[in-house]
Amino acid sequence: MFTLAPSILSGDFAYLGEDLKTIKSAGCRWVHVDVMDGNFVPNITIGMPTVAALRKYTDLVLDVHLMIDRPLRYVEAFCKAGADYVTVHVEADTTENNLLALDKIHALGAKAAVSLKPNTPASAVLPFLDKVDMILVMTVEPGFGGQSFLENQMEKLAALRALCAERNPECLLEVDGGVNAQTGA
């Protein structure tokens, strides 16, 4: 089974409300919200006010992907803005701070996730595996939309599926980047 979460980054920012209606009318129940700070990745996108505006406009699951340095500083604000899932990158801070971020996300009633860049091994999730509701695997280099799917990430997904089956069978796996009708099949 899979869930399709279209990325708001692919939308027209002047018409995000209309884009959310289109996503929902197409049968999707999730929307992926990429937050970039210009430091962790070279691009800058949106912040908490946009997430809060999206939350007021839709009941879709807001899957907020923080591609930002030291996300512990901001997870509370994104949860309070209405994120249903908040994803932090294992590479964005220390293990200790990322564990604190996951705990804070859960304490605020949201689901917690970690993400791995393409060059980060599957084993990097081990310190977090018992605390996450989802693991996101970047299938492009994070920072810009429109890139091609990195097929070599399929091995990482298989390794993560095995780890989750053993230690956290309820954990969801998510791929982000280059997903289309061919790569998503």
Please annotate each region the language model reported:
Residues 95, 121, 143-144:
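Short glycine-rich, flexible loops that bind phosphorylated cofactors or substrates
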Residues 119-121, 180:
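Short acidic loop-to-helix transition motifs that present clustered carboxylates
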Residues 114-116:
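Short, hydrophobic beta-strand segments that form beta-sheet elements in well-ordered domains
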Residues 89-91, 138-141:
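Short beta->alpha connector loops at strand-helix junctions that form conserved
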Residues 1-87, 92-100, 104-107, 111-112, ...:
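Conserved N-terminal beta1-alpha1 strand-loop-helix module at the mouth
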